[in-house]
Amino acid sequence: MNIPFQSANCFPVHKKDIPVYEIGQFCGIPFDQFRLCAFFGVPEGDSVKIYTVLSDENSDKLSIISTILKKDSEYSSLTVKFPQFHLFERELYENYKIKPVGHPWLKPVRKISANYPFFKCNGSETHEVAVGPVHAGVIEPGHFRFNCAGENILSLEIMHGYQKRGVEKLFLNGDIFSKRSLAESICGDSAVAGVSAYTGLLESLGNLKIEKTAQVQRALMLELERAAVHIGDLGAIAGDIAYISGADFYGAVRTIVINTSQSFGGNRFGRGFVGIGSNRFSIENHIAEKAVKNLRKVKDDIDAISSAFFS
């Protein structure tokens, strides 16, 4: 099937140019040949227009396609063949009651229920351990349901949604330029990712051309943010298996990364760096040289601790 691709991200597309497929034709698309970026519904009267954004990693191109279904209707679940649709289909069903028939795990994504149907393991030697939603200090509240056999964890199911803020609706009201800070606040450790997506949206719609240097600096901030998240996850894994020295080491290395971000724009999480049409800070040469030294040390330290951790 020929899917019209756009040349790159941050490229405006008129709604009337987005192809609309009949649902049977839509479900026949070989989605396993692409990476699923987005799958969401937009109400149109008593129907919902479902947009799907796909990326082709071999060509670095994006496409956007759509289909239209009535609210409270049904279609054959895409998750059965393409697991990447798993959460997207659950959210679509939760919001619009469009049922993906055959979905293997059709549970609410955000709705909190006293009788939530957690996965269970039956057996005389199994037991459940419930953790949260109030736990662990600074991270988002979540309920973790462990099924265990002795000290062995058989399964873990996580339920979030306790602090759903309705961010999408907040974006619909007020001055669009004031939403930059809101975009930074969608996810605390991904501030640069959120604001880069939002500013990229405004810049592409406004046909604003961003200087090459500014683009490179944004990419650098995104990579620092990504590295900090990955290193933090490695530290969390080490802590979960009681490898305390590893957890401490990863935490110390992560601090070097976020302190480098702070040297660029005054905030360890990159808040305030990305502006609309340009960046709000400029990275001076002497700061860049220090950053290079920091990142070389980070690489050496991560290689050393990971060699021990995964041996």
Question: Where do the PLM segments sit?
Answer:
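Active-site bordering "gate/hinge" segments
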Residues: 1-26, 30, 39-46, 50-71, ...
